Structures are given as structure tokens and as C-alpha cells.
A protein has these predicted regions:
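Outer-membrane beta-barrel translocator/channel fold
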Residues: 75-89, 99-115, 132-146, 166-169
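Non-transmembrane, interaction-prone segments in cytosolic or luminal domains
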Residues: 52, 60, 71, 119, ...
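Feature captures outer-membrane beta-barrel proteins of Gram-negative bacteria and organelles
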Residues: 33-40, 56-65, 85-94, 114-123, ...
Length: 181
């Protein structure tokens, strides 16, 4: 009913550099081709892909200096309305972490979605945090919210529990437990 082939060639191991060709022939869907490339070392990771419809995807992560990582994710599509860009920066301090994110930011009319997170460790097993979200999808629409979270860690770090609350009345509880090594 069809065939699929993925051909990957590692051109270098340090830094890592590889290319991939993926083919799909016949079957229920149409024939398809995708080209991908990956490059990375201890400070950067770059990944990109191009398909036969002209869609380009990319992901770039860059360690600027200890504790600071900048990230870019994007998709560019020939069909209107399907492209997006996400810009992000993580900072990991000794007892806190911060993250800033912009989704489809526009410098001309300041539209987009902007998110800031902060998590502060209060004891070795307990942390509190907040998330601010500013949504401005079009010049006529604006909305800002602030949510809160708490994180508890087991004495031997064998479990993690979190609680999150958003002002729209949304609450979320999570629990993770390590069962074995």
C-alpha cells in the first residue's frame, strides 16, 4: 500500500551535524518528501526541516553564558495564517528560575502573546511561583492574567507534586512518583 524511507547521514559527531531525507510513496496519502538538518555542540542546538509543500520549520537553542539559554522556534508556511514564531529566554539561578516567552510578536503594532514565569525556591523541598500572560492577538483585543503555582518535592526527590491556579477559575494538580531506577 505504500512505502516510507528515512535516510540519515551523520556528517560530523563533534560538533554533531547530520542530514535526513524522508520519503513517503503511495499509500492512502500523497507522496511526500522532507529534508532535515541538525547541528549542535555544548552551547548550541539547531534543527531545521523543509517539506515538499514549502513549509519550513526550525528550532534554535543557544547557551549564551551559564544559566542563560535563548530559544527560537518557527514555522513558515506558504499558506497564509499558518506561520508562527516563538522567542524564549530561560534563566536558571541558584534558587530560582525565570522564563520569558513571546509568541508571534509584532514590533509594528505590539500584537502577540507574551508570557513571564518566575519560580522561587523557599526551602529545599518547596517553591512558589507566578506566571503573567499578556495576550494582544489583534490591535482591538487585549487581556492580561496572573496565575500562581506551588511545587513540593519528596525528601529523597522520589516524588513531585504541583498545584496551579489561574484567575479564570482553572486549577490543576499534578503528581509524579519515581517507581524504580
Amino acid at each position: 500500500e505504500g512505502a516510507r524511507a528515512d535516510l540519515t547521514k551523520a556528517l560530523s559527531m563533534n560538533p554533531i551535524f547530520q542530514v535526513t531525507h524522508a520519503f513517503t510513496l503511495g499509500g492512502a496519502g500523497k507522496n511526500a518528501y522532507n529534508f532535515g538538518a541538525v547541528y549542535g555542540d555544548e552551547k548550541r542546538f539547531y534543527q531545521a526541516g523543509l517539506d515538499d509543500a514549502g513549509n519550513v520549520t526550525m528550532r534554535l537553542n543557544r547557551l549564551l553564558f551559564p544559566g542563560h539559554i535563548s530559544k527560537i522556534q518557527a514555522q513558515f508556511a506558504p499558506a497564509g495564517g499558518q506561520s508562527f514564531v516563538q522567542l524564549e529566554h530561560d534563566f536558571q539561578g541558584s534558587d530560582y528560575s525565570m522564563n520569558f516567552k513571546a509568541l508571534n510578536p509584532s514590533p509594528t503594532n505590539l500584537t502577540g502573546i507574551y508570557v513571564a514565569n518566575y519560580l522561587q525556591t523557599l526551602t529545599p523541598r518547596f517553591a512558589l511561583g507566578a506566571e503573567a500572560v499578556y495576550q494582544h492577538p489583534s490591535p482591538e483585543i487585549e487581556e492580561a492574567t496572573v496565575g500562581y503555582m506551588a511545587k513540593w518535592v519528596g525528601p529523597a526527590k522520589e516524588w513531585i507534586a504541583t498545584a496551579q491556579w489561574q484567575p479564570q477559575g482553572i486549577a490543576q494538580l499534578t503528581y509524579w512518583h519515581q517507581l524504580s531506577e
